[in-house]
Design a protein with these regions (language model features):
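Extracytoplasmic "Venus flytrap"/periplasmic binding protein-like
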Residues: 63-128, 156-162, 169, 267, ...
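Extracytoplasmic/periplasmic substrate-recognition and gating elements
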Residues: 67, 161, 288-353
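A structural signal for short loop-to-beta-strand junctions that line the ligand-binding cleft
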Residues: 89, 96-97, 122-158, 189-191, ...
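Short, solvent-exposed loop/beta-turn-alpha elements that line the ligand-binding surface or hinge
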Residues: 116-130, 193, 197-200, 215-240, ...
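Extracytoplasmic/periplasmic solute-binding protein
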Residues: 140-144, 149, 175-227, 273
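Conserved C-terminal helix/tail region of periplasmic/extracytoplasmic solute-binding proteins
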Residues: 159, 183, 360, 366-367, ...
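Glycine-centered hinge/linker elements that transmit conformational signals in sensory
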Residues: 178-179, 224-258
């Protein structure tokens, strides 16, 4: 498992054990991948969003500095602390020259800091202009990776339980299989799902990624791509899949508040569970299971037409350049971005299975060595409809945190009254946070 050695805590005060989109550890990521600054060449300061990719970004920064002489500093924010850390760092005299937002909602907060990328070299490398993040007539950001998540599963364990992927085409099928495994878990020696940990290293999988499904289907039904007033049309479906996870997992649901992302990884890699909700970025943590033994299913919630549903594919990773940086630093940052997606060293680190394992929306994207990426591509080639990442329209981090807290309370005591807390967090708090964001 990949352990992060350099994590910058929120406000540079609190270090969190974390696993944002996969495994990580703790520490301070304020080490510089460069030495003395040559102001004539400019310099780069990248505030990285992904703790699980910290080590690779540090290596890539060093490689670029060794090759060009341009100093590159990479600082990695702790899981769930990026926005807080970005606010803190932007207030400093040497602020990040390269940062990221998650899409339109994030851009609304930082648009006044974004350099217009129109005419920059990196835009010429994109495979589609849909990865440009617009602010009016300006191009404020560029998506640098696409990722996919779903229900990763162990083929051998599923087969031992008497099933294959072909037996699971809907929520009803998944429920049948999971509950059957639970009934026979002592005989089989494993559970259906890894623990749905709700500590800060794991809760994003459910308050954000799982919550994406009911939002996506509501948007599809209403023919919209964003809203300031979510209705919660598919909240019953959200409850059904959450119930399935927490009542057919490796631990009692009352223990989930203290379960971590590392716990789930350990449970999956030691064959304690068949299913593990995560994405293509998790491959490095679970590779020991074996490429031929890894599968991935759509996350079914019982929505209409889900038999044609694919995996959840998208991006919430848009690079933005700080327009308040010096002219030299802006150019150095633009050059670094372009090098990352065009050079042999950059693309290998970004796309390779031994690197970050990204699929990048640029012409030099490499054929993936990550079997989970290939599974995602296979779903699309067979005509399944990818589930858009609608969580970039979630109104705020506070909304996610409130939803996560309500889910945790409900898991410990699964009553209708406690589910009402989830409904309130989902619907009422959405409207409240959306209204606050527009003030």
């Amino acid at each position: 498992m990949r352990k992060m050695k350099r994590l910058l805590a929120a406000g540079l005060a609190t270090i969190m054990a974390c696993s944002m989109l996969t495994g990580c550890g703790s520490g301070s990521s304020d080490k510089k991948a460069s030495s003395d600054k040559d102001s004539s060449k400019g310099s780069v300061y990248y505030l990285n969003f992904k703790p699980e990719a910290d080590e690779q970004w540090q290596e890539l920064a060093k490689e670029y500095t060794d090759e060009t002489g341009v100093p590159v500093t990479v600082v990695t924010a702790a899981a769930n602390q990026y926005e807080t850390t970005l606010k803190s760092e932007m207030g400093k005299s040497e602020a990040p020259t390269l940062f990221q937002v998650n899409g339109p909602v994030g851009l609304a907060s930082w648009k006044d800091y974004c350099y217009d990328l129109t005419g920059s070299d990196i835009l010429n490398e994109l495979t589609s202009d849909k990865f440009e993040l617009k602010n009016g007539d300006e191009i404020a950001g560029v998506g640098y990776c696409t990722e996919t998540y779903g229900l990763i599963y162990n083929k051998a364990l599923l087969k031992k339980a008497g099933y294959t992927q072909d037996d699971i085409k809907s929520f009803a099928d998944l429920k049948k299989v999971a509950e059957d495994i639970t009934k026979r878990k002592d005989e089989l020696g494993f559970s259906a799902f890894t623990s749905a940990g709700m500590d800060g290293s794991s809760d994003w999988r459910f308050k954000t990624h799982l919550a994406n499904l009911p939002i996506y289907y509501e948007y599809q039904k209403d023919g919209i791509t964003d809203t300031k007033a979510i209705k919660g049309t598919y909240l019953d479906n959200y409850r059904n899949i959450w119930d399935l996870y927490i009542n057919n997992g490796t631990c009692d649901a009352k223990q989930l508040s203290k379960k971590t992302g590392d716990d789930a990884v350990a449970e999956f890699t030691t064959e304690q569970a068949v299913f593990y909700q995560n994405g293509t970025w998790a491959y490095g943590d679970i590779a020991d299971v074996g490429d031929d033994n890894l599968g991935m299913l759509p996350i079914y919630i019982g929505a209409p037409g889900e038999e044609k549903q694919g995996l959840c594919t998208g991006t919430e990773n848009y690079w933005c350049v700080n327009k308040n940086a010096s002219k030299e630093d802006i150019q150095a940052t633009l050059d670094f971005m372009n090098w990352c997606v065009t050079s042999e060293e950059g693309t290998k680190m970004m796309c390779g299975a031994d690197g970050m394992g990204f699929v990048i929306p640029f012409k030099n994207n490499l054929e993936s060595e990550n079997p989970l990426v290939n599974i995602a591509n296979d779903y699309m080639e067979k005509g399944y409809t990818p589930v858009d990442w609608t969580f970039s329209t979630m109104p705020s981090e506070q909304w996610k945190n409130d939803l996560g807290s309500a889910l945790t309370t409900y898991a410990a005591d699964q009553t209708d009254a406690n589910w009402k807390l989830v409904q309130t967090a989902f619907v009422d708090e959405w409207a409240k946070e959306a209204a606050a964001a527009t003030k």
